[in-house]
Protein backbone atom coordinates (compact mmCIF):
# COMPACT_ATOMS: atom_id res chain seq x y z
CA UNK A 1 0.00 0.00 0.00
CA UNK A 2 2.78 2.43 0.94
CA UNK A 3 4.60 1.74 -2.32
CA UNK A 4 1.43 2.38 -4.34
CA UNK A 5 0.80 5.64 -2.50
CA UNK A 6 4.39 6.73 -3.10
CA UNK A 7 4.14 5.81 -6.78
CA UNK A 8 0.94 7.82 -7.20
CA UNK A 9 2.49 10.79 -5.42
CA UNK A 10 5.56 10.62 -7.66
CA UNK A 11 3.40 10.33 -10.78
CA UNK A 12 1.37 13.37 -9.71
CA UNK A 13 4.53 15.40 -9.06
CA UNK A 14 5.96 14.28 -12.40
CA UNK A 15 2.86 15.51 -14.23
CA UNK A 16 2.93 18.81 -12.35
CA UNK A 17 6.60 19.40 -13.23
CA UNK A 18 6.36 18.04 -16.76
CA UNK A 19 9.14 15.47 -16.33
CA UNK A 20 9.12 11.75 -15.53
CA UNK A 21 10.86 11.25 -12.19
CA UNK A 22 10.72 7.44 -12.36
CA UNK A 23 10.21 4.81 -15.10
CA UNK A 24 6.75 4.09 -13.68
CA UNK A 25 5.88 7.80 -13.79
CA UNK A 26 6.98 7.91 -17.43
CA UNK A 27 4.43 5.22 -18.32
CA UNK A 28 1.75 7.04 -16.34
CA UNK A 29 2.50 10.29 -18.19
CA UNK A 30 2.16 8.53 -21.53
CA UNK A 31 -1.42 7.69 -20.57
CA UNK A 32 -2.15 11.11 -19.09
CA UNK A 33 0.04 13.71 -20.83
CA UNK A 34 -1.38 16.68 -18.93
CA UNK A 35 -1.17 18.20 -15.47
CA UNK A 36 -2.85 16.70 -12.40
CA UNK A 37 -6.20 17.81 -11.01
CA UNK A 38 -9.60 18.52 -12.52
CA UNK A 39 -8.21 21.39 -14.61
CA UNK A 40 -5.19 19.44 -15.84
CA UNK A 41 -6.47 19.22 -19.42
CA UNK A 42 -7.33 22.91 -19.63
CA UNK A 43 -4.96 25.35 -21.27
CA UNK A 44 -2.99 27.13 -18.59
CA UNK A 45 -2.73 30.87 -18.36
CA UNK A 46 0.68 32.48 -18.84
CA UNK A 47 2.85 31.79 -15.80
CA UNK A 48 4.59 34.66 -14.05
CA UNK A 49 8.39 34.90 -14.21
CA UNK A 50 8.50 33.87 -10.56
CA UNK A 51 6.34 30.79 -11.20
CA UNK A 52 8.55 29.73 -14.13
CA UNK A 53 11.72 30.03 -12.03
CA UNK A 54 10.12 28.31 -9.05
CA UNK A 55 9.01 25.36 -11.17
CA UNK A 56 12.48 25.00 -12.69
CA UNK A 57 14.02 24.94 -9.21
CA UNK A 58 11.49 22.34 -8.12
CA UNK A 59 12.26 20.23 -11.19
CA UNK A 60 15.95 20.15 -10.40
CA UNK A 61 15.30 19.39 -6.72
CA UNK A 62 12.91 16.58 -7.58
CA UNK A 63 15.34 14.90 -9.98
CA UNK A 64 17.90 14.65 -7.18
CA UNK A 65 15.33 13.99 -4.45
CA UNK A 66 16.80 16.58 -2.10
CA UNK A 67 15.36 18.95 0.48
CA UNK A 68 15.26 22.72 0.04
CA UNK A 69 17.99 23.24 2.65
CA UNK A 70 20.30 20.89 0.73
CA UNK A 71 19.53 22.69 -2.52
CA UNK A 72 20.27 26.07 -0.96
CA UNK A 73 23.62 24.88 0.41
CA UNK A 74 24.57 23.46 -2.98
CA UNK A 75 23.63 26.75 -4.65
CA UNK A 76 25.75 28.78 -2.23
CA UNK A 77 28.73 26.52 -2.90
CA UNK A 78 28.14 26.76 -6.66
CA UNK A 79 27.98 30.56 -6.40
CA UNK A 80 31.36 30.67 -4.64
CA UNK A 81 32.97 28.32 -7.17
CA UNK A 82 34.73 29.69 -10.23
CA UNK A 83 32.67 29.38 -13.43
CA UNK A 84 28.97 29.58 -14.27
CA UNK A 85 26.87 29.18 -11.14
CA UNK A 86 24.11 27.16 -12.84
CA UNK A 87 26.51 24.68 -14.39
CA UNK A 88 28.43 24.41 -11.12
CA UNK A 89 25.19 23.66 -9.28
CA UNK A 90 24.23 20.74 -11.51
CA UNK A 91 27.77 19.36 -11.52
CA UNK A 92 27.99 19.46 -7.71
CA UNK A 93 24.61 17.74 -7.32
CA UNK A 94 25.67 15.08 -9.80
CA UNK A 95 28.69 14.22 -7.63
CA UNK A 96 26.42 13.16 -4.76
CA UNK A 97 26.80 9.47 -3.98
CA UNK A 98 23.11 8.67 -4.45
CA UNK A 99 23.08 10.39 -7.86
CA UNK A 100 26.06 8.38 -9.06
CA UNK A 101 24.60 5.12 -7.72
CA UNK A 102 21.57 5.83 -9.89
CA UNK A 103 23.58 6.91 -12.91
CA UNK A 104 25.77 3.79 -12.67
CA UNK A 105 22.69 1.58 -12.94
CA UNK A 106 22.81 0.14 -9.42
CA UNK A 107 19.29 1.47 -8.74
CA UNK A 108 16.09 2.13 -10.68
CA UNK A 109 15.20 5.48 -9.10
CA UNK A 110 16.89 8.18 -7.04
CA UNK A 111 14.77 7.13 -4.05
CA UNK A 112 16.01 3.55 -4.33
CA UNK A 113 19.59 4.77 -4.74
CA UNK A 114 19.29 6.83 -1.56
CA UNK A 115 17.84 3.83 0.29
CA UNK A 116 20.71 1.59 -0.81
CA UNK A 117 23.21 4.10 0.54
CA UNK A 118 21.37 4.65 3.84
CA UNK A 119 21.15 0.88 4.40
CA UNK A 120 24.95 0.67 4.05
CA UNK A 121 25.07 -1.47 0.93
CA UNK A 122 27.32 0.99 -0.93
CA UNK A 123 31.05 1.47 -0.47
CA UNK A 124 33.48 4.10 -1.69
CA UNK A 125 37.10 2.98 -1.99
CA UNK A 126 36.40 0.02 0.28
CA UNK A 127 34.68 2.01 3.03
CA UNK A 128 30.94 1.86 3.73
CA UNK A 129 29.25 5.23 3.26
CA UNK A 130 25.69 5.76 4.51
CA UNK A 131 25.24 9.44 3.56
CA UNK A 132 23.45 9.98 0.23
CA UNK A 133 24.90 13.51 0.09
CA UNK A 134 28.50 12.24 0.28
CA UNK A 135 30.58 14.03 -2.36
CA UNK A 136 32.40 11.50 -4.51
CA UNK A 137 35.84 12.66 -5.60
CA UNK A 138 37.55 12.20 -8.94
CA UNK A 139 39.06 8.73 -9.19
CA UNK A 140 37.04 7.22 -6.36
CA UNK A 141 35.49 3.78 -6.81
CA UNK A 142 31.83 3.18 -5.94
CA UNK A 143 30.94 -0.46 -5.38
CA UNK A 144 28.43 -2.72 -3.68
CA UNK A 145 29.45 -4.50 -0.48
CA UNK A 146 30.33 -8.13 -1.14
CA UNK A 147 27.65 -9.42 1.24
CA UNK A 148 25.01 -7.33 -0.52
CA UNK A 149 25.82 -8.47 -4.05
CA UNK A 150 23.71 -11.63 -3.70
CA UNK A 151 20.55 -9.69 -2.78
CA UNK A 152 17.82 -9.70 -5.48
CA UNK A 153 17.92 -5.93 -6.20
CA UNK A 154 21.65 -6.10 -6.92
CA UNK A 155 21.33 -9.28 -8.97
CA UNK A 156 18.79 -7.43 -11.12
CA UNK A 157 21.12 -4.43 -11.37
CA UNK A 158 24.14 -6.60 -12.26
CA UNK A 159 22.14 -8.06 -15.15
CA UNK A 160 21.92 -4.54 -16.59
CA UNK A 161 18.25 -3.85 -15.89
CA UNK A 162 18.81 -0.21 -14.94
CA UNK A 163 21.78 0.73 -17.14
CA UNK A 164 21.31 3.94 -19.12
CA UNK A 165 21.37 3.75 -22.91
CA UNK A 166 24.25 6.21 -22.83
CA UNK A 167 26.32 6.03 -19.65
CA UNK A 168 27.87 9.47 -19.00
CA UNK A 169 31.55 9.71 -19.93
CA UNK A 170 32.53 10.79 -16.43
CA UNK A 171 31.68 7.30 -15.14
CA UNK A 172 33.54 4.08 -15.87
CA UNK A 173 30.95 1.40 -15.07
CA UNK A 174 31.49 -2.34 -14.75
CA UNK A 175 27.90 -3.31 -14.11
CA UNK A 176 28.47 -7.07 -13.84
CA UNK A 177 30.91 -6.37 -10.99
CA UNK A 178 28.63 -3.65 -9.55
CA UNK A 179 31.47 -1.13 -9.71
CA UNK A 180 31.66 2.41 -11.04
CA UNK A 181 34.51 4.90 -10.94
CA UNK A 182 34.10 8.67 -11.18
CA UNK A 183 36.91 9.31 -13.64
CA UNK A 184 36.52 13.11 -13.61
CA UNK A 185 34.20 15.91 -12.62
CA UNK A 186 30.95 15.82 -14.63
CA UNK A 187 30.33 18.52 -17.23
CA UNK A 188 26.86 20.05 -17.25
CA UNK A 189 26.33 19.11 -20.90
CA UNK A 190 26.81 15.43 -20.01
CA UNK A 191 24.53 15.28 -16.97
CA UNK A 192 21.19 13.64 -17.91
CA UNK A 193 18.86 15.94 -15.98
CA UNK A 194 16.21 18.18 -17.53
CA UNK A 195 16.74 21.70 -16.27
CA UNK A 196 17.28 25.26 -17.43
CA UNK A 197 19.76 25.96 -14.67
CA UNK A 198 19.96 29.70 -15.36
CA UNK A 199 16.33 30.00 -14.25
CA UNK A 200 17.30 28.28 -10.99
CA UNK A 201 20.10 30.81 -10.51
CA UNK A 202 17.65 33.64 -11.15
CA UNK A 203 15.24 32.17 -8.59
CA UNK A 204 17.84 32.19 -5.82
CA UNK A 205 19.28 35.56 -6.88
CA UNK A 206 15.95 37.36 -6.64
Curated annotation (Swiss-Prot):
Record key words, sorted: Ribonucleoprotein, Ribosomal protein, RNA-binding, rRNA-binding
One of the protein's GO biological processes: ribosomal small subunit biogenesis
UniProt KW Ribosomal protein keyword: yes
Record region (Disordered): 28-48
Gene Ontology cellular-component terms listed: small ribosomal subunit
Gene3D superfamilies found in the cross-reference section: Ribosomal Protein S4 Delta 41, Chain A, domain 1, RNA-binding S4 domain
InterPro entries, sorted: Ribosomal_uS4 (IPR022801), Ribosomal_uS4_bac-type (IPR005709), Ribosomal_uS4_CS (IPR018079), Ribosomal_uS4_N (IPR001912), S4_RNA-bd (IPR002942), S4_RNA-bd_sf (IPR036986)
Domain of life of the organism encoding this protein: Bacteria
One Pfam assignment: S4
One annotated GO molecular function: structural constituent of ribosome
Domain S4 RNA-binding: 95-160
Record family assignment: Belongs to the universal ribosomal protein uS4 family.
Reported function: One of the primary rRNA binding proteins, it binds directly to 16S rRNA where it nucleates assembly of the body of the 30S subunit.
UniProt subunit comment: Part of the 30S ribosomal subunit. Contacts protein S5. The interaction surface between S4 and S5 is involved in control of translational fidelity.
Name of protein: Small ribosomal subunit protein uS4
Protein's gene: rpsD
Amino acid sequence: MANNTRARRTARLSRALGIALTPKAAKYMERRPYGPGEHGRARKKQDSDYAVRLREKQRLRAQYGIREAQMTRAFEEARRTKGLTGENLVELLEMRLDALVLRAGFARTIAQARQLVVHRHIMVDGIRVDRPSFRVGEGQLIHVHSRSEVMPPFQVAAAGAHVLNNVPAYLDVKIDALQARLVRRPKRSEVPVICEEQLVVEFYAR
